[in-house]
């Protein structure tokens, strides 16, 4: 008689995704980040749920309620620190996951990749509205600056901004709706994640050499379930260390001051994981141009599959494109640094060069390198 996990309608779904899933035997630790993102999402939903039990989304009490959570709620300080730093780990994992996809050509699974880009946008949106909730100075001014960007939309920009604000400035209505969105979006992300996995399991996983692995597959459990478990332990250890030893390392000191619409902080900047996009936004002097550049800095990922010119899938055997990939990584680091710097010489020009290079690598250099490597292969033969 067949076992229950193979016959029960519900358990069968979990079995096909987590136990009997045929997995390429040679996938490396770079394939761990998908499951780590799942762990991050679950951690964020659970800690967020407990925070929501004590938080009040009213401008007169929001800041005090966060203080109350940290001082009076049992382990409230821990829940808040894990939630705040968990967001950073979420983005570390998501950027590593995307980098893996770019390096090994996983983007050729177009549906999976495009839903992944939508997931990235949803996570960014969730993190942005979440950052506003403590109602500190950087929360308030960050919300003001970023929502104000929508005023660059032709004809309906100002109306759009006021509609999002729920008034003529970032106020109580804004905070209330941002809390509602911040509560709702993680569940939308969870649903999109299931669709992401559904499309992935239609094709099966890619692997480091980019070749068809049908001839060499192993079951997901126990081989990769234990490998994922090791990843969980390492990430949870790192998150715990950060949350317990230096919980405010990645935050902005400005956010310890309650929001004051009459005092502008000297440097308004988002959390570290948005700095690269913020640098691209600031590198264009025109408001609408900057907003479009900001949007395309993420949406450019959607055109990557269309610009794949190489006969090989990954970069494992493609040294020229490898060099360009690591140039992109260095460029992202430079953009992140520039995003946190004041708008003055020499940071302006460095940011502009880095922004041009960012788009050039995706749209020009990488497709060209793929074409060149095809030619080199022909000559070598």
UniProtKB/Swiss-Prot annotation:
Transmembrane segments: 33-53, 77-98, 113-133, 178-198, 226-246, 288-308, 320-340, 347-367
Cofactor requirement: heme b
Record's bilayer topology term: Multi-pass membrane protein
CDD domains documented for this protein: cytochrome_b_C, Cytochrome_b_N
InterPro entries: Cyt_b/b6_C, Cyt_b/b6_C_sf, Cyt_b/b6_N, Cytb/b6-like_sf, Cytochrome_b, Cytochrome_b_C_euk/bac, Cytochrome_b_N_euk/bac, Di-haem_cyt_TM
Protein keywords: Electron transport, Heme, Iron, Membrane, Metal-binding, Mitochondrion, Mitochondrion inner membrane, Respiratory chain, Transmembrane, Transmembrane helix, Transport, Ubiquinone
Role of this protein: Component of the ubiquinol-cytochrome c reductase complex (complex III or cytochrome b-c1 complex) that is part of the mitochondrial respiratory chain. The b-c1 complex mediates electron transfer from ubiquinol to cytochrome c. Contributes to the generation of a proton gradient across the mitochondrial membrane that is then used for ATP synthesis.
Description of how the protein assembles with itself and partners: The cytochrome bc1 complex contains 3 respiratory subunits (MT-CYB, CYC1 and UQCRFS1), 2 core proteins (UQCRC1 and UQCRC2) and probably 6 low-molecular weight proteins.
Protein name: Cytochrome b
């Amino acid at each position: 008689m067949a076992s229950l996990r193979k016959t029960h309608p519900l358990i069968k779904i979990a079995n096909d995704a987590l136990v009997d899933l045929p997995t390429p035997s040679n996938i490396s630790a770079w394939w761990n980040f998908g499951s780590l993102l799942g762990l991050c999402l679950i951690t964020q939903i659970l800690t967020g749920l407990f925070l929501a039990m004590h938080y009040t989304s009213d401008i007169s009490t929001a800041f005090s309620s966060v203080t109350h959570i940290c001082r009076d709620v049992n382990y409230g300080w821990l829940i808040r620190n894990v939630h705040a730093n968990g967001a950073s780990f979420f983005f570390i994992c998501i950027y590593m996951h995307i980098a893996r996809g770019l390096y090994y050509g996983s983007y050729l699974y177009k549906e999976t990749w495009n839903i992944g880009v939508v997931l990235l946008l949803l996570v960014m949106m969730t993190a942005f509205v979440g950052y506003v909730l403590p109602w500190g100075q950087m929360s308030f001014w960050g919300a003001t600056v970023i929502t104000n960007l929508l005023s660059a939309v032709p004809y309906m920009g100002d109306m759009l901004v006021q509609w999002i604000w729920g008034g003529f400035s970032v106020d109580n209505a804004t905070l209330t709706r941002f809390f509602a969105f911040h509560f709702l979006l993680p569940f939308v992300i969870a649903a999109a994640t299931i669709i992401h996995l559904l499309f992935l399991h239609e094709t099966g996983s890619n692997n480091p050499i980019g070749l068809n692995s049908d001839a060499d597959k192993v079951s997901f459990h126990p081989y990769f379930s234990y490998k994922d478990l090791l990843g969980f332990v390492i990430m949870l250890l790192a998150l715990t260390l950060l949350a317990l030893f230096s919980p405010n390392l990645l935050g902005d000191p400005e956010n310890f001051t309650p929001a004051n619409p009459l005092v502008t902080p000297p440097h308004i900047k988002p959390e570290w994981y948005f700095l690269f996009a913020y640098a691209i936004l600031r590198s264009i002097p025109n408001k609408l141009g900057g907003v479009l550049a900001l949007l395309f800095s993420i949406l450019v990922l959607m055109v990557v599959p269309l610009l794949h010119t190489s006969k090989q899938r990954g970069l494992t055997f493609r040294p020229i494109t490898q060099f360009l990939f690591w140039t992109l990584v260095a460029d992202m680091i430079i953009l992140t640094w520039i995003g946190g710097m004041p708008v003055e010489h020499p940071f302006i020009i460095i940011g502009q060069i880095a922004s041009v290079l960012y788009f050039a690598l995706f749209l020009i250099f990488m497709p060209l390198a793929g074409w060149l490597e095809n030619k080199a292969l022909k000559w070598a033969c």
